[in-house]
């Protein structure tokens, strides 16, 4: 048996990252929108998305990226699934706060433009948005040879729910039924550690063939009847 692996040994200090995020949040200015106004922030404890007021509704925003899974996908020539990962990471976060995903925009950064790569990304993003029933409303493509050394892909999703309809977990009580949805495999979290642990490229190919799945179709009935999100 080799030495146990953790995030720190793979190059990611999650404790330092948590401190950095706390410093960022502490430096952000409060909203210029007062409660009751369009765009006023809505506090949702433990929420996976940013929420604002919008009349009788609330809008929810989530942003996330594919991360270091892109590095592996590029090396083994399997970029066809990363669009699914990008869309799923965002729409699944919206579902966690009780929002119905409506629209998605992507951000692609590359050191050098490659029509074949962009075509593969565009096709998978489009397919994923169709499956998740969200509109692919646009995006940004940046060629940044002086800043970006490898492909980076991220996105932002917009959703909505009626005011008062968000998932807060406030009504949880003993005896409630906990429903677990099966995972299709390793999605897009923890691939820096995966890369450090797994060195057999055949196994990596098999892992990459599993695409992240938007939870929308299986989750909406549950959400309509009330729910709470637990991630682990």
Task: Name each model-derived stretch.
Residues 2-232:
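Helix-biased detector of long, well-ordered alpha-helical tracts
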């Amino acid at each position: 048996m080799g030495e146990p692996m953790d995030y720190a040994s793979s190059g990611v200090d999650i404790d330092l990252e948590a401190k950095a995020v706390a410093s960022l949040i502490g430096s952000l200015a409060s909203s210029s929108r007062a409660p009751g106004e369009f765009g006023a922030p809505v506090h949702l404890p433990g929420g996976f998305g940013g929420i604002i007021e919008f009349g009788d509704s609330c809008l929810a925003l989530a942003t996330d990226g594919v991360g270091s899974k892109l590095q592996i996908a590029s090396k083994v020539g399997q970029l066809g699934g990363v669009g699914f990962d990008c869309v799923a990471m965002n729409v699944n976060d919206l579902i966690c706060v009780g929002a119905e995903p409506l629209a998605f925009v992507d951000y692609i950064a590359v050191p050098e433009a490659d029509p074949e790569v962009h075509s593969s990304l565009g096709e998978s993003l489009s397919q994923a948005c169709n499956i998740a029933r969200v509109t692919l409303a646009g995006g940004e493509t940046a060629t940044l040879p002086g800043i970006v050394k490898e492909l980076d892909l991220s996105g932002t999703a917009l959703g909505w729910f009626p005011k008062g309809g968000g998932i807060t977990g406030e009504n949880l009580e003993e005896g409630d039924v906990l429903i677990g949805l099966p995972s299709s495999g390793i999605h897009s979290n923890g691939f820096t550690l995966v890369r450090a642990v797994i060195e057999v490229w055949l196994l990596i190919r098999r892992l990459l063939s599993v695409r992240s799945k938007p939870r929308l179709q299986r989750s909406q009935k549950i959400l309509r009847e009330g729910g709470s999100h637990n991630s682990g």
